[in-house]
Amino acid sequence: MNTFDKGTVIRTVLLLIALINQTMLMLGKSPLDIQEEQVNQLADALYSAGSIAFTIGTTLAAWFKNNYVTEKGKKQRDLLRDNNLTK
């Protein structure tokens, strides 16, 4: 028996869902009873969540890069101090 990788299975399932959705639309059936306001609220919520996640991620990355928080970083700081290379 052939085994399929995870990506192939996911793409196939999504293709089937898209085909079923398109067929239902062609037959005049609404596959999902969603109001436009609900879509707008979801888009706003996703934008806000993405914005918060991006801000937190970039803040933590900048903090980590600009501070000597690891053992290696502390050794680098001490070496810079010993050679008078810090401000």
Swiss-Prot record:
Keywords: Membrane, Transmembrane, Transmembrane helix. It comes from the Bacteria. The keyword Membrane applies. The chain crosses the membrane at residues 45-64. Pfam families: Holin_SPP1. Its main location: membrane. GO terms for cellular component: membrane. It is a single-pass membrane protein. It is found in: Membrane. Belongs to the SPP1 holin family. Involved in cell lysis upon induction of PbsX. This is Holin. It comes from Bacillus subtilis (strain 168). The lineage of its organism: Bacteria, Bacillati, Bacillota, Bacilli, Bacillales.
